[in-house]
Amino acid sequence: MSSLSGKVQTVLGPIHPEQLGRTLTHEHLSMTFECCYCPPPAHQGTLSDAPILMKNLFWVKQNPYSNKENLLLSQEIEAITEEIMIFKAAGGGSIVENTTTGISRDIKMLKKMAEETGVNIISGAGFYVDATHSSSTRSMTVEQLTEVLVNEVLQGADGTNIKCGIIGEIGCSWPLTESEKKVLQATAEAQSQLGCPVNIHPGRNSDAPFHIIQILQEAGADISKTVMSHLDRTIFDETKLLEFAKLGSYLEYDLFGTEMLNYQFNQAVDMPSDNDRIKMLRLLINEGYEDRIVVSHDIHTKNRLLKYGGHGYSHILNNIVPKMLVRGISQQCVDKILLENPKQWLTFK
């Protein structure tokens, strides 16, 4: 049994689970996303290097990965700190920060934000998708990768003594690469040693979450303490969603606020609206899965910040919760999704 058993580990140290309050389970507060830059069409090429202005804001919102400045969330620390305070004023208590190795995790900055705002911040250990893996990461064995993950939780990350409180988001592509498979196997082994929560970023294919769960199970993971992220852009068929729900992971709808005509990473996909997301939550609740749902915004680009006319970290509390209540989701279920389920997930076994 880990010394962290029964506790939640924040960047400021362990806390009692009851101290979490309303929790966003998948956000980014300081990161860069240059790994996923998408060059714009030739006739719009100058927009890639343009500053974000009112006159190009619609274009940036529809093509968020084609504007280089938009991918540098770590430039907006002051604005993000202010927005965390707005989240707190709206009734928020904790944020799980899922930035891992490969997309510029800054755990020192997360500690500073937690100290300045009084909001609990839980940092993620691990590695993002294969495209961000270094040659040294790719050359590691499962045992070596496991040691890295365990050390980031027990000793500290990035050369500091600031410790991660989850493993994840662990990045997976579609199809899964060999390096990503090793990281998944290491994640399962580290989780079995630590009893810690895990968060997975699946590839953009409806079969990806199933494949990932199979690999984790075979490697000894605790699926009941594992979150499958981004289901709102991954599984659209209701029957398939309910089939996946039976596997026992937490079901994360974490793109609230993302309503766009153009989903750059998969042009064949219609990104659901927030109203569509609420419908899927209601379906899962009606089928008995209210204990397995968690929600968030996954803010990872500047355009989604309040500073740039976006929804910010308070969107779920200010705008989505009232709509959930109007649309047939009880206050008891809302509290489970925002309070109880994150608490159960984040508490070390």
UniProtKB/Swiss-Prot annotation:
Localization annotation: Cytoplasm, Cytosol
EC id: 3.1.-.-
Binding site for a divalent metal cation 1: H26, H28, E169, D298
Record-annotated disulphide pairs: none
Pfam families associated with the record: PTE
Annotated Gene Ontology cellular component terms: cytosol
Binding site residues for a divalent metal cation 2: E169, H201, H230
Reactions listed under catalytic activity: N-acetyltaurine + H2O = taurine + acetate; N-propanoyltaurine + H2O = propanoate + taurine; N-acetyl-L-methionine + H2O = L-methionine + acetate; N-acetyl-L-isoleucine + H2O = L-isoleucine + acetate
Cofactor names: a divalent metal cation
Role summary: N-acetyltaurine hydrolase that catalyzes the hydrolysis of N-acetyltaurine into taurine and acetate. PTER also acts on other N-acetyl amino acids (Met, Ile, Leu, Val) and N-propionyltaurine, but at lower rates.
Name of protein: N-acetyltaurine hydrolase
Organism: Xenopus tropicalis (Western clawed frog)
Origin organism lineage: Eukaryota, Metazoa, Chordata, Craniata, Vertebrata
